[in-house]
Amino acid sequence: NLIDFKNMIKCTTKRSVLDFADYGCYCGSGGSGTPVDDLDRCCKVHDDCYGEAEKVHGCWPKWTLYSYDCSNGQLTCKDNNTKCKDFVCNCDRTAAICFAKAPYDDNNFMINNPRCQ
């Protein structure tokens, strides 16, 4: 769910989730156009993963509760007993790890929406 995802981001990046709420064309609500950089691509992949969770698996990824561990910046999805919990946890885990690896460019925070056409 979105609260767990926020905490995963904090675990891997030590940044506030607000730093990612309006970044590039895909980080935050919705998304369109071409991702502006690697971090924005992470967000597009995460959006696509949530889309697959909804369409293919019938999940509600923004509300699906799951279990995970965070230790020294390492994320592990725990033994989630349903396909939705496991799938959504891995969507969020993959994105949080991707966020940690991708450079953060302040110039891509709150960018002009026409760049995302």
Curated annotation (Swiss-Prot):
Molecular function GO labels: calcium ion binding; calcium-dependent phospholipase A2 activity; phospholipase A2 activity; phospholipid binding
Pfam families: Phospholip_A2_1
Regions crossing the membrane: none
Reactions catalysed according to its record: a 1,2-diacyl-sn-glycero-3-phosphocholine + H2O = a 1-acyl-sn-glycero-3-phosphocholine + a fatty acid + H(+)
Tissues of expression: Expressed by the venom gland.
Active site location: 46, 92
Positions glycosylated per UniProt: 80
GO CC terms in record: extracellular region
Swiss-Prot/TrEMBL GO biological process terms: arachidonate secretion; phosphatidylcholine catabolic process
EC number: 3.1.1.4
Keywords: Calcium, Disulfide bond, Glycoprotein, Hydrolase, Lipid degradation, Lipid metabolism, Metal-binding, Secreted
Cofactor: Ca(2+)
Enzyme class: hydrolase
InterPro entries cross-referenced by the UniProt entry: PLipase_A2, PLipase_A2_Asp_AS, PLipase_A2_dom, PLipase_A2_dom_sf, PLipase_A2_His_AS
PROSITE patterns, alphabetized: PA2_ASP (PS00119), PA2_HIS (PS00118)
Binding-site residues, Ca(2+): 26, 28, 30, 47
Cellular location(s): Secreted
Record's function text: Snake venom phospholipase A2 (PLA2) that shows strong myotoxicity and induces edema in mice. Shows no cytotoxicity in vitro. Has a strong anticoagulant effect in vitro. PLA2 catalyzes the calcium-dependent hydrolysis of the 2-acyl groups in 3-sn-phosphoglycerides.
Family membership: Belongs to the phospholipase A2 family. Group I subfamily. D49 sub-subfamily.
Name this polypeptide is given: Acidic phospholipase A2
Organism: Micrurus dumerilii
